Every structure is written in structure tokens, then in C-alpha cells.
Amino acid sequence: LDFFFVVEFVTNGRIDFKKLNESLNNKFPMKDTKAYLVLDWEGKVYDDLWSKNNYKESMSQFISAIDFIKKNRPNIKVGYYGIPSREFWNADAVWQNKNLLLAPLYKKVDFLANSVYMFYTDSEVKSVLNTNYIKQNVELALTIGKKFNKPVYPVIWHRYHPSNQHFGLMNIPLQSFRTYINDILETEVQGKKVSGVFWWQADIYYRKTEINNKNLKKEYSEIKNFDEYDVK
């Protein structure tokens, strides 16, 4: 499993085939490699997948990346991070229907890798809201996965989303994390469950880029050897 971030295959908001090819050669030098690859294309082009004016162009860009990878690494299974999109407060019929419009992309990907990061602690919102958030987002992915015969691998994280001003980047308590994972694994739509999860890990990156985050400062204050440090 590997992730390609937007800087590894996109230039100025457009697919950069030279850059994508370099990334493939760097991460998967053997052309017959078997692996899972998640493309993380966040930003305007991603947002435009749900716009009226730029939908076709964005869809074309997203699909062309998959076609290129399939041509050059035919044994790699590829999908997009955040497809279908995530919703916490407005997981309604409008959100569901908008995601169903991405049928051309669902037909192309090998799997769905919807993001189910945790935003709030149970002390900030009622635990049932966190449970419903997980259930509704996984159910939508499973519904789409069943329709297009695609496995679902929700992307999870052991930290709260950085948008949370009080708890952002703090480790999710172990028992809460177990509940989080179990809720994902137990969600079912017409007999279909997730095929697994993709566990995002970027502690080294955030340690370098979020040096002023109060929660990371507290966590790392007594760490002497980061190479041996393990999330507990």
C-alpha cells in the first residue's frame, strides 16, 4: 500500500504525466508490481467533481490518472482518497445523491477509499453523533461499492482531525479508537461490509510541520528517540 500526494502527480491543478511516471518509477520500479495505490488529489479539482461548471474537466483529469497508471503498472490496484466524499453534519440525501453522480469514476477505480477521520471527542459531541457519522459515511461507500462491485477500504487515522481547535492531532484514546474501528468493521449494507481499512500514518510529517501544535508539543515533550517512538 502506498499513497501518492498531489505534489507527486499534479502540476498547477492538472495531471502531470511526467511527474506521475517518475513517482511510479520511484515507488514501483518493477512494472509487474502488485500493490494498492491511493491517489490523494485534494483541492479545487477534487471539489469541482461536485460542481456544475467544471465537473467534466475534473472527472476527465481524475480518470486520466487512473488510465495512465493502469497502462504502465497493470497489476496495481488504484483508488482515490476521499471518494465518496465525507460528511459529518449534513449526511443527507443531497450529499448521497451528489456522490452517486461520480459513476464514471467508480467504474474506473479498483476500490473505494473514503475518508472516515474523527473530528470530535465524545466530550465535545454526543457519542451517538460520532457513531452515526461513521455509520452513515461507511454505509454510503458500501452502497456505492455494492452497486459497482468495488471493495471498500475506509481511510482511518489514530489522531483527531487538525481542524479541531482543542483536540486536533491528539491521539484518539485507545478505547475510543477500538470503538471507532469496530463501528467501521460492523457496518453492513445488504450483506456487504468493508474489506479492511487503510491506516494513515504521518507522524514524522506532522512533527516537522506542526511544531506549534499544543497537543503534539505535549505528546513529544518527553520523547528522546523518535526513531524508537511508537504510538501507544
What is each PLM-predicted segment?
Residues 1-86, 169-178:
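Substrate-binding cleft of extracellular glycoside hydrolase catalytic domains
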Residues 37, 41-48, 97-132, 199-203:
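Aromatic- and acid-rich polysaccharide-binding/catalytic face
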Residues 62-99, 147-163:
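Aromatic-lined carbohydrate-recognition surfaces of secreted/lumenal glycan-active proteins
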Residues 116-117, 151-232:
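Substrate-binding cleft of secreted/luminal carbohydrate-active enzymes
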Residues 117-163:
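Glycoside hydrolase catalytic-domain groove-lining segments
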